[in-house]
């Protein structure tokens, strides 16, 4: 069962998570857009690295919102969809983004927001999102 919601993430902590995600992207030579949202899915912080495709802006925000609103990584939706059959129902969920790269941000066992990245392959987006999430784990 997913963690409960806690007090929403603030700007300073959101910037810290984004900075860790961007550092991971830079080390690997990837250009990314990163979005951090609060528990309601509202944007708290956003940054687009130089040379990031503009389409990644909306995708990063969507991944972050999905992870916050559904309390799970977007990869969970990707995996369900890949299974086909009843998993295709995920396409009918408003706000679901079935592509890896969105991860809930958890502090003290409670979801405080989520981070979403876009710009690379979905596995690269996920790797950077997890780096951002790992930066705030208490």
What do these predicted ranges mean?
Residues 1-138:
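Flexible, solvent-exposed loop/hinge segments and secondary-structure transition points
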